[in-house]
A protein has these predicted regions:
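Conserved nucleotide-sugar phosphate-binding/catalytic loop shared by glycosyltransferases and other
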Residues: 13-72, 302
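A nucleotide-sugar donor-handling region in carbohydrate enzymes
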Residues: 127-196, 222-227
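Donor-nucleotide binding loops and adjacent catalytic segments primarily
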Residues: 173, 179-255
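Acidic donor-binding loop of glycosyltransferase active sites
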Residues: 253-264
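Catalytic binding pocket for nucleotide-activated donors in carbohydrate/polymer assembly enzymes
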Residues: 266-311
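A charged, aromatic-enriched C-terminal amphipathic alpha-helix characteristic of glycosyltransferases
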Residues: 321-345
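Conserved N-terminal entry element of GNAT/NAT acetyltransferase domains
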Residues: 345-359
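Acetyl-CoA-dependent GNAT
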Residues: 381-429
Length: 430
């Protein structure tokens, strides 16, 4: 889904987009074909059981073939479609690494060769990419995880400020007010929710002490638990069951608390400042969910197999009594897709300027603490949020300071320009 979000923005900027997908149960090929050209690879001969596998072995089983065979299938599909060159190859698969990437580049054989964007969050294998995106949060380690895994010249876009969200999130980010009272809960554990955490959550919310809470439940029609969840929804007043949604933005914006999984929806909730209770339902969700919990950006309840209805009920009771569940609102402003599109295609439109606004505080702090910025600053130590807040607040009312934010064609902030005048001397910071 994140690749579709990126593809939409690239197409809006004039790029020609194609997807290469292997046929398998539950694939999204027909959905993608409604918008894009899709080249489908031959299906797996038989789905091997992967229940006992983990780590690299598990991700290799997801691929279903050797990386060399998969690359040959991709190249064959491209050749049959008459595609012999590309400006960028975008790969988003845990089972692929530098060997597949090398085979694809060499197999296309175009001059110049295609550049390569890798989307990853595992940091457990080598890549030969020109651009790497990892939109997840790992605390102080966020900027260091890919050392030695990518070429020295690879540009790394790391952290939630690059989260691939739909354009509605950037528009709503400055408009949604902070939550001050718990009145409405959003329940979403993914479209399928194999472990039926949606049902468990509703069982917890059937307790009379939560009767005043309105509840929005989102679940895909293909979920094996849809009917049982619908039955629970019918037992609870002021509770609505929603089927598949083109975007969760409206439901997130009107909720006061969310409970859900720790996947990509984490950044949608954070962008709109929604305090969240999180259950890690997949192994790759746990590391960054733990980091977010430790930093106070959400409350991690635990991993899927460890959470009971009683624990869920207790978590809701605590959320009612103490408004201490983090939201992560400062982590992302919703412009990640635009930032990545600009990194891929460049800035080919005039840049506009606007005055800095109160809502820019978190963004300016992220920029100031970027490793490249700190390395070229008078002090290489990260700026603390409390110190930055005092400096930022003073600057907003300082008549001797002019601070501007350049915007790209999508109105995405791409930098800052500051003019200061002190005792007849002027300084410029870019």
């Amino acid at each position: 889904m994140r690749c579709r979000t990126l593809a939409r923005e690239l197409r809006r900027r004039g790029a020609e987009i194609g997807f290469v997908c292997r046929q398998q149960p539950g694939d999204l090929i027909e959905m993608l074909r409604q918008e894009f050209q899709v080249l489908s690879l031959p299906p797996l001969a038989a789905a091997a059981s992967s229940s006992s596998l983990e780590g690299r072995a598990l991700y290799g089983a997801w691929l279903g073939f050797s990386q060399q065979q998969d690359a040959e299938d991709c190249l064959s599909a491209l050749a049959k479609a008459g595609i012999s060159s590309a400006q960028w190859l975008v790969v988003d698969h845990y089972g692929l690494d530098a060997s597949w990437e090398r085979a694809m580049r060499e197999g296309l054989g175009s001059e110049p060769p295609p550049q390569l964007l890798v989307i990853d969050d595992l940091a457990d294998r080598s890549h030969i990419c020109d651009l790497l995106l990892d939109q997840n949060f790992f605390g102080a380690a966020t900027q260091q995880r890919y050392g030695g895994l990518v070429p020295a010249q690879c540009r790394q876009l790391l952290g939630p400020q690059y989260a691939l969200l739909g354009p509605e999130y950037a528009l709503l980010h400055p408009l949604v007010p902070p939550r001050t009272e718990l009145r409405r809960v959003l329940v979403f554990f993914g479209g399928v929710d194999h472990d039926n955490f949606t049902g468990r959550t509703l069982e917890a919310l059937l307790n009379p002490k939560f009767a005043h809470l309105a509840v929005d439940v989102v679940l895909g029609l293909q979920s094996p638990h849809f009917q049982s969840v619908a039955s629970l929804v019918a037992q609870r007043p002021n509770t609505t069951l929603h089927g598949p949604q083109p975007s969760l933005a409206v439901l997130i914006a009107r909720a006061d608390l969310a409970i859900g999984a720790g996947g990509a929806t984490t950044w949608e909730r954070a962008c709109l400042g929604l305090p969240s209770l999180v259950v890690a339902i997949a192994a790759n969700q746990l590391p960054f969910a733990q980091c977010l919990d430790q930093a106070g950006h959400l409350q991690l309840l635990g991993v899927a197999g460890e959470i009971s209805v009683t624990q869920l009920r207790q978590a809701f009771a605590e959320a009612l009594q103490v408004a201490s569940v983090g939201s992560g609102h400062c982590l992302t402003d919703g412009w990640g897709t635009s930032r990545l599109a600009s990194a891929l295609l460049g800035l080919d439109h005039p840049i506009r300027l606007r005055l800095v606004a109160p809502g820019d505080e978190a963004l300016l702090l992220r920029w100031a603490n970027d490793p490249a910025v700190r390395a070229s600053s008078f002090s290489t130590q990260p700026i603390q949020s409390e110190d930055h807040h005092s400096w930022f607040e003073a600057g907003l009312s300082n008549p001797e300071r002019l601070q501007l934010v350049p915007l790209d064609q999508s109105n995405c902030p791409i930098g800052q320009i500051r003019f200061d005048r002190i005792d007849g001397l002027a300084s410029i910071d870019i």
